[in-house]
Amino acid sequence: LGAEISSLTLEEAR
């Protein structure tokens, strides 16, 4: 529960 959230947030915030 860290890489998934960071990846999703980074991709969405893009």
From Swiss-Prot:
Keywords: Ribonucleoprotein, Ribosomal protein. It comes from the Eukaryota. One of its GO terms (cellular component) is ribosome. Belongs to the eukaryotic ribosomal protein P1/P2 family. This is Large ribosomal subunit protein P1. It comes from Populus euphratica (Euphrates poplar). The lineage of its organism: Eukaryota, Viridiplantae, Streptophyta, Embryophyta, Tracheophyta.
